[in-house]
Amino acid sequence: MLRRAARTVGQLLLPAHCAACGSPAPPDGRWPLCAACARDLADLLSAPYCPACGRHAGPYTAGPDGCAFCRQYPVPFDAAVRAGAYGGPLKTLVLRCKYGPRPALATVLGRLLAERLALAGWADHVDRIVPVPLHWSRRVRRGFNQALGMARELVRAVPGAGRVDRRTLVRTRPTAHQTGIPAARRRQNVRGAFRVRRGTDLAGETVLLVDDVMTSGTTVAECTRVLKRAGAGDVYVAVAATADFDDPGPW
């Protein structure tokens, strides 16, 4: 019975077909991808990015003090880490996880992110891991929160965090999907959409905020401001992917 259960879990995490392109080629043994998609994923994971804001950055164009973009528009959070650039098989994994829906892929995305998080010099200082919440109505329709599934995989990379606290942040109202919305409307869309749950003591804590994709950054920026107003010290951001955004502006 235990062997059968283990095999079932293995099939969920490492299906017989590539989770990105659907080819029947067997996964490479580590990720649920064929060899070709695994190579493409490796390129996405190695793309340089700014450690301050998480946006794409060319080689030698960003450092601990940020990149040209976040020097112009300072970020409200203290640093960011990502698994890779939003494209190719990584984009497919994110979309299939969220809309498939395939909750098991949140585990895969979380493991990809955990490898990058373990390299961050600030990771050992995290006190609690907080996934960006869905509004209850969307969570009911989707059946799960992909950010929560990813966050659970990060506990091993951040031993000091102890556990994921999914109750810290509350989404107070449903918000429109951010896709295709200009930056100014994105900021308005999420303004006032989050609060810290009553009775939560964040005084001086270092928080790791987790989400699947960061495009304009308005969602994680709003969550960061809410957490800091409630007393959090440093707030770091971890996302599976960051996407290009044609209309950047203040956070």
Predicted segments — roles?
Residues 1-251:
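Glycine-rich phosphate/pyrophosphate-handling loop used in enzymes and phosphotransfer proteins
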